[in-house]
């Protein structure tokens, strides 16, 4: 009876994935997709999304059917800034806590990219060996994803001005994310400090839990929302720069902005202090300090977001499996001899023979690793958060002939501003690479909303990319000296990193410029494979 109850609980948790009929030819779906992937690599045509496109065409229910196998469902991560790093954190933390996690590689944050990623993980028969999926989705593609798969968890980070040629005004982006909140069946985790995101609580369906992550009052001024940015920039010169993850905070004048109206919402995880690769989080009324490997103060807030959604998953796992363990303990206490187990004499099930418990769990169709995850402590979650390293291009450090080269992705005014504030130019050489391909956004007018005056003292060694001359003009208006300008990105990157050997380098780059920068560096140094995880 206990086994059947647990089995029923697990099947109910899988109901967040829309059910579809399996076509008779589904046995060939994975093989066909892998053949297309192989052919596209050999011919160097089609890109990484082509296998997903083909699979969507021949077997539209593949995505829904495959993710429907996951006992803990899907975590969907979306928002303007921080998706990749936060997805990496959530996936790494859940994995370190014992779960088997499927996640989409960096850059595959659209539906076909997820399908393509699945092709590398499933068996030829379509079996996905994982407990949970953690998926980064672009705001626009997330809308299409939730029509096929209703996520059990949604983590919505922020809404900033980003690629307005794609989305229009930021209210349009918020509307896109509202569809995600409305489709979530278990828990929606929202950024309390972003008014547009916090407002999405109203879109969560009945029965869906809403949790928030937030900031302590004295940190809120350092993480302005898009609506706060004009106010923040207007006082920045007088108040001083933002803190970095490398530099302890110092007091500065009070800023009151649009996020003040949401400050009273209860936060499940609150970032209360940051310092030199350190952060303190408050959960359940208790503070937890940890060292962090991530760079940039903004990534410490991403860590708060990741902790909030991991806590939500753990709470559900506890609700699913711990009552079963208690029931098992009661049966053992009633008749330990008949079950072949022992109690500790105090009515506790701590001494239950693990082999017997595992046998019952396997009979119920529950993975023992999920039971172990249900026992994860808050301190264990904090410890795993501190071990996550930067995602590629997001504070990633590549060593070239002994010189550290740090890649910093920038794609909108707020992200660029926070990066400039977090990574001080003194003692480093700076390069900026700007492209305007589709993945970057065609409209580069947002560069004029970034304050580059912090670079006046050191100047910029090199500017490159398709829009190098636009960037150079923008720097000239802020009276920032520029040594060289070239649209030949690969040559410029190599020249830049080889100059002034031993001097640390910072390269600020848009998305496609970052990919090309990594490719250029891979020819002269060891560059890790792109992906999510450690």
Q: Each predicted region: which residue ranges?
A:
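Phosphate-binding loop of NTP-binding sites
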Residues: 8-9, 13-209, 249-255, 327-344
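A generic structural signal for short, well-ordered alpha-helical segments in conserved domains
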Residues: 87-92, 307, 472, 518
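Buried hydrophobic packing segments
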Residues: 90, 94, 114-118, 303-313, ...
């Amino acid at each position: 009876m206990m086994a059947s109850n647990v089995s029923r609980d697990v099947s109910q948790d899988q109901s967040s994935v829309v059910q579809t009929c399996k076509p008779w030819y589904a046995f060939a779906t994975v093989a066909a997709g892998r053949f297309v992937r192989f052919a596209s690599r050999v011919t160097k045509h089609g890109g990484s999304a082509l296998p997903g496109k083909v699979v969507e065409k021949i077997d539209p229910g593949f995505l829904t059917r495959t993710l429907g196998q996951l006992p803990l469902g899907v975590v969907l991560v979306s928002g303007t800034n921080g998706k990749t790093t936060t997805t990496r954190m959530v996936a790494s933390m859940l994995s370190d806590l014992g779960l088997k996690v499927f996640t989409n590689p960096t850059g595959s944050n659209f539906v076909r990219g997820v399908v393509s990623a699945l092709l590398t993980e499933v068996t030829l028969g379509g079996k996905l060996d994982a407990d949970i999926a953690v998926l980064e989705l672009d705001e626009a593609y997330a809308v299409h994803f939730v029509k096929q798969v209703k996520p059990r968890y949604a983590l919505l980070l922020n809404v900033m001005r980003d690629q307005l040629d794609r989305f229009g005004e930021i209210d349009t982006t918020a509307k896109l994310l509202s569809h995600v909140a409305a489709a979530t069946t278990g828990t929606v985790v929202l950024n309390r400090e972003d008014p547009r995101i916090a407002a999405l609580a109203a879109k969560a369906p009945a029965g869906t839990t809403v949790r928030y992550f937030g900031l302590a009052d004295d940190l809120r001024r350092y993480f302005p929302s898009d609506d706060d940015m004009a106010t923040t920039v207007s006082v920045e010169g007088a108040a001083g720069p933002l803190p970095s993850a490398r530099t302890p905070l110092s007091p500065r004048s009070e800023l009151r902005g649009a996020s003040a109206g949401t400050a009273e919402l209860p936060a499940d995880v609150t970032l209360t202090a940051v310092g030199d690769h350190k952060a303190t989080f408050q959960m359940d009324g208790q503070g937890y300090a940890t060292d962090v490997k991530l760079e940039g103060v903004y990534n410490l807030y991403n860590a708060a977001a990741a902790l909030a959604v991991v806590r939500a998953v753990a709470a559900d796992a506890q609700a699913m499996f711990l009552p079963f363990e208690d029931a098992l303990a009661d049966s053992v206490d009633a008749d330990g001899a008949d079950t072949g187990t022992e109690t500790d004499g105090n009515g506790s099930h701590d001494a239950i023979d693990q082999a017997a418990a595992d046998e019952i769990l396997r009979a119920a169709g529950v993975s023992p690793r999920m039971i172990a995850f249900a026992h994860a402590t808050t301190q264990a979650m904090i410890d795993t958060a501190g071990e996550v390293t930067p995602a590629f291009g997001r504070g990633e450090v590549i060593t070239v002939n002994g010189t550290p080269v740090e890649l910093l992705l920038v794609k909108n005014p707020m992200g660029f501003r926070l990066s400039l504030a977090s990574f001080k130019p003194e003692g480093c050489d700076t390069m900026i690479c700007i492209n305007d391909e589709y993945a970057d956004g065609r409209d580069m007018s947002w560069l004029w909303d970034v304050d580059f005056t912090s670079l006046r003292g050191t100047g910029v060694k090199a500017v490159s990319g398709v829009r190098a001359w636009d960037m150079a003009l923008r720097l000239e208006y802020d009276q920032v000296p520029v040594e060289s300008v070239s649209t030949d990105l690969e040559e410029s990157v190599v020249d830049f990193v080889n100059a002034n050997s031993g001097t640390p380098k910072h390269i600020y780059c848009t998305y496609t410029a970052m990919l090309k920068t990594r490719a250029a560096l891979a020819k002269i140094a060891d560059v890790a494979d792109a992906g999510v995880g450690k």
